[in-house]
């Protein structure tokens, strides 16, 4: 169970961090466009 939980956390971080980074860039681009 512990390994599965750690793997789940690692996957969530691996997906959420780049997504948040791209989202921030997108918001900045839209703000500059407007």
From Swiss-Prot:
Keywords: Chloroplast, Membrane, Photosynthesis, Photosystem II, Plastid, Reaction center, Thylakoid, Transmembrane, Transmembrane helix
Gene Ontology terms describing biological process: photosynthesis, light reaction
UniProt keyword Chloroplast, yes or no: yes
Principal localisation: plastid
GO cellular component, one term: chloroplast thylakoid membrane
Subcellular location: Plastid, Chloroplast thylakoid membrane
Protein's membrane topology: Single-pass membrane protein
Domain of life assignment: Eukaryota
Regions crossing the membrane: 5-25
Classification via PANTHER family: PHOTOSYSTEM II REACTION CENTER PROTEIN M (PTHR35774:SF1)
Similarity comment: family membership: Belongs to the PsbM family.
Quaternary structure note: PSII is composed of 1 copy each of membrane proteins PsbA, PsbB, PsbC, PsbD, PsbE, PsbF, PsbH, PsbI, PsbJ, PsbK, PsbL, PsbM, PsbT, PsbX, PsbY, PsbZ, Psb30/Ycf12, at least 3 peripheral proteins of the oxygen-evolving complex and a large number of cofactors. It forms dimeric complexes.
Purpose of the protein: One of the components of the core complex of photosystem II (PSII). PSII is a light-driven water:plastoquinone oxidoreductase that uses light energy to abstract electrons from H(2)O, generating O(2) and a proton gradient subsequently used for ATP formation. It consists of a core antenna complex that captures photons, and an electron transfer chain that converts photonic excitation into a charge separation. This subunit is found at the monomer-monomer interface.
Protein name per Swiss-Prot or TrEMBL: Photosystem II reaction center protein M
Species classification: Eukaryota, Viridiplantae, Streptophyta, Embryophyta, Tracheophyta
């Amino acid at each position: 169970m512990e390994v599965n939980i750690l793997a789940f956390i690692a996957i969530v971080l691996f997906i959420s961090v780049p997504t948040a980074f791209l989202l921030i860039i997108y918001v900045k681009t839209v703000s500059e466009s407007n």
